[in-house]
Regions:
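N-terminal lobe of the biotin/lipoate ligase/transferase fold
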Residues: 2-227, 231, 392-398
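Nucleotide and nucleotide-moiety/phosphate-recognizing core
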Residues: 163, 185-302
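SH3/SH3-like beta-barrel fold
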Residues: 366-371
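Short, mixed charged/polar active-site loops
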Residues: 250-253, 351-353, 376
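Conserved, helical-rich catalytic subdomain that frames metal- and/or nucleotide-binding sites
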Residues: 291-354, 359, 388-398
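Structured surface patches comprising rigid loops and adjacent beta-strands/short helices at the edges
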Residues: 372-398
Length: 398
């Protein structure tokens, strides 16, 4: 039996495995009946020592296991650069020649041009040419950074923002330190579309509304693909403020971070969408198979291209006409019109709970609701709950 010492907080349930674990412990966890993973034992008697040579196959499998458990191993991250036209490809050559791109914590990277890559595609690798051929934007998504495995697409974009063209996108097949709300870190397995891209905005008042435009663009992109391919409509919905749901199960999320420099907000927008991995909940292709016997499957490359094609148009409306011009379309897609929620309101030294009905969004991007007393109010999260609809705080609107 081969063994591996796992780190704390190893709570990931391995597919097709019977897993026994102890949260917040330093023990090794036992994994049995798994076709994909080695068995792990509480004894380390047979574990290879630093002096014990292991072959390449063993090394890769050990690395796969240790990465899944969150161990601190920093391999070289490969970044493949490409562009829609010669102009973007010249930018790619310049970035490579000047060794411009960096990652946090001095993570070692290897930069390669897509035109230099002679390795055949493997498995579910992102197909760059398929994506670029489907892209029809003027700005967004035309410069691409792809990696088979990387800590975080958000880090690639935010750490190199000033050196990248506007609308540049980084997409990864696997990321093992994906960013979430409240600085949560996520491991994103194969089958997910994970990408981040650059946006610059001047009006800070509308930056919080950008995530709504992004989520709307993704739902509309899935509709466009379905219409083009003659597929049944998948009811992809928006859960405020930044999640995507199918059949009451989460399949995606949006994260926007920004910095202010030279009178502009540099926004890094990150999106994760479960396209073809039905664990731990569901994915787009599973939802499609439940609706139709079609052999068609959603492809990450099409979704990314259709997303940018739609986002660029919606973003133009957003900047020039405001979010009000998109509200009707947004409300058709979100989950909350008419939803009744319990909110908290401070009265003197007590916290009183009231039931209100959601009406829409306020100009600042929070929830607009009405109480049983017909008093309009703004709802915002308390920042302590993973569920935005637990612990909502009520503020009266005059």
């Amino acid at each position: 039996m081969l063994t591996l010492l796992c780190c704390r907080n190893f709570s990931k349930v391995l597919r097709d495995s019977k897993v026994s674990y102890r949260r917040d412990s330093r023990y090794i966890f036992s994994v049995v009946n798994s076709p994909s993973f080695w068995s792990l034992s509480k004894t380390i008697a047979s574990a290879p020592t630093p002096e014990t040579p292991i072959n390449e196959r063993e090394r890769k499998r050990l690395f796969s296991l240790s990465s899944a458990s969150g161990m601190d191993i920093s391999p070289i991250c490969a970044l493949v650069l490409s562009g829609k036209t010669a102009a973007e490809n010249e930018t790619a050559k310049l970035l490579k020649r000047n060794d411009t791109l960096k990652l946090p914590d001095d993570t070692e990277i290897s930069v390669l041009l897509h035109s230099e890559r002679d390795k055949p595609l493997e498995g579910n690798e992102f197909r760059i040419d398929l994506y670029l051929n489907a892209l029809s934007t003027d700005t967004f998504g035309r410069f691409l950074i792809w990696s088979p495995r990387i800590p975080s697409t958000q880090d690639v974009i935010s750490h190199n923002f000033s050196n990248l063209p506007l609308g540049a996108v980084c997409v990864a097949d696997v990321q093992f330190k994906g960013r979430g709300r409240s600085k949560n870190l996520w491991e994103s397995p194969p089958g997910c579309l994970m990408f981040s891209f650059t946006i610059q905005m001047e009006d800070g008042r509308i930056v919080p509304l950008l995530q709504y435009v992004i989520s709307l663009a993704m739902t509309e992109a899935i509709k466009d693909i379905s219409n083009e391919e003659g597929l049944p409509y998948i009811d992809l919905k928006i859960k405020w403020p930044n999640d995507l749901y199918v059949n009451d199960l989460k399949v995606g999320g949006i994260l926007c971070t920004s910095t202010y420099r030279s009178k502009k907000f540099n926004v890094t927008a990150g999106i994760g969408l479960n396209v073809d991995n039905d664990e731990p909940s569901t994915c787009l292709n599973e939802a499609l198979s439940n609706l139709s016997s079609t052999p068609y499957k959603f492809r990450k490359e099409d979704i990314l291209a259709f997303f940018f094609n739609k986002f660029e148009r919606l973003y133009d409306v957003f900047i020039n006409q405001g979010f009000r011009a998109l509200e009707d379309l947004y409300y058709q897609t979100w989950l909350h019109s008419g939803q009744r929620v319990i909110v908290q309101e401070k009265k003197e030294d007590q916290v009183v709970e009231n039931v209100v009905t959601i009406q829409g969004l306020t100009s600042s991007g929070y929830l607009l609701a009405i109480g049983d007393d017909n008093q309009m109010c703004e709802l915002h999260p308390d920042g302590n709950s993973l569920d935005f609809f637990k612990g909502l705080i009520k503020s009266k609107l005059v």
